[in-house]
Amino acid sequence: MTLISHDERLIKALAVAIVDRPRATLKELAEAAGVSKATLHRFCGTRDNLVQMLEDHGETVLNQIIQACDLEHAEPLEALQRLIKEHLTHRELLVFLVFQYRPDFLDPHGEGARWQSYLEALDAFFLRGQQKGVFRIDITAAVFTELFITLVYGMVDAERRGRAASSNSAHTLEQMFLHGASNPARS
């Protein structure tokens, strides 16, 4: 689903609204997003349709992120920086996806099949980085993918809850991913 600029802003506002007010009515969600109930009703019809639209848009955005970062060809460190930046550009949708997470959300045999191309692209990227000697080889590419997702999604959730400042998130994520929590002065 390709959204025009106005719809993109609306969907981001609705993603935040539904996370901040999970039991809100469509009218309350419309108010939180800064539109009328009639506009929201025309946009999605029902709350279930809204959730489906947000999930569909999340899938589209994640695939666009993968494409924009050129993970197959770019130098791994440069691609990692772009990957972090692109994810943070869409932090509202990431927060929504975290909010929607269920234990079977990523099950490749169920509804999670829709996320497999995203996960496979990240796995392939980290494997390529390992093969080029950029990322360590004692951790599997799949685990790197899980760690990356956990760090990025955790950071955007921490920002939402006021526990992290968004201004430094990209640098913090890059440093944690590449160097861990050890004190650089002790190296």
Swiss-Prot record:
The keyword Transcription regulation belongs to this UniProt entry's keyword annotation: yes
Key words of the record: DNA-binding, Repressor, Transcription, Transcription regulation
Gene Ontology terms: cellular component: protein-DNA complex
InterPro entries assigned to the protein according to its UniProt record, in alphabetical order: Homeodomain-like_sf (IPR009057), HTH-type_TetR-like_transc_reg (IPR050109), Tet_transcr_reg_TetR-rel_C_sf (IPR036271)
Any one GO molecular-function label of the UniProt entry: DNA-binding transcription factor activity
DNA-binding region(s), residue ranges: 26-45
PROSITE patterns from the UniProt entry: HTH_LACI_1 (PS00356)
Biological process terms in GO annotation: negative regulation of DNA-templated transcription; regulation of DNA-templated transcription
PANTHER family on file: HTH-TYPE TRANSCRIPTIONAL REGULATOR BETI, HTH-TYPE TRANSCRIPTIONAL REGULATOR RUTR
Known function: Confers resistance to guinolones. May negatively regulate the expression of genes that are associated with cell permeability to drugs.
Name of the protein this chain belongs to: HTH-type transcriptional regulator NfxB
Species of provenance: Pseudomonas aeruginosa (strain ATCC 15692 / DSM 22644 / CIP 104116 / JCM 14847 / LMG 12228 / 1C / PRS 101 / PAO1)
Annotated gene: nfxB
